[in-house]
Amino acid sequence: RMSLVVDIEKKLGSFTLRSQFETDSGTMALLGASGCGKSVTLKCIAGIMTPDRGRIVLNGRVLFDSEKRTDLTPQQRRVGYLFQQYALFPNMTVEQNILCGIREGSRSEKRALAAEKLRMFRLEGLEKKHPAQLSGGQQQRVALARILCSEPQAILLDEPFSALDSYLKWNLELELSDLLAGFHGPILWVSH
């Protein structure tokens, strides 16, 4: 059964963040004012930050447990993280960025998977372009294609549309929902 169980505490300046929830496959949103700890929660799940105490379990596998001193590296967690600014490598082409997400397989298998993701995310013809030459929506699709190439068990979306105007934001939210419709694990979406 696909599930994500989070029960953590993290001291943040003058307050202690307490994040406790459980979700199965499907989309769940974390909503709240800026600075309340939504992004910190995602970073703790991804292994980018370490909670002070608690436990994080993904699909029955313990990612973090303060009592048992378990703290898997980000690479071991199999969690896809879409940053606010997409975190594409500016010196690499679209194709190279997507290839970075593929861990296993021969060179030809990796190229075939990258080509499949280019088609799936409607990025054909942009393979040799660099991120700076792409629109925000195209950059987001490249980042998502790269994430899905790594076969994550959960996807974390950290305010993916925070910098966009409301009309563009609405269109990209619809597009993102379509692109993630085939993903069968938990999807955690942070917004404010």
Predicted features along the sequence, with ranges:
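Hydrophobic anchor residue at the start of the ABC signature
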Residues: 144
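Conserved ABC ATPase "signature" region
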Residues: 61-66, 109-126, 177-178
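Catalytic Walker B motif of ABC-type/P-loop ATPase nucleotide-binding domains
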Residues: 155-159
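A short, proline-enriched helix->beta-strand linker immediately N-terminal to the Walker B motif
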Residues: 149-153
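Conserved ABC ATPase signature
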Residues: 130-134, 138
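Short coil-to-helix segment of the ABC ATPase nucleotide-binding domain corresponding to the Q-loop/switch region
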Residues: 91-101
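ABC ATPase NBD coupling module
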Residues: 63-80, 104-112
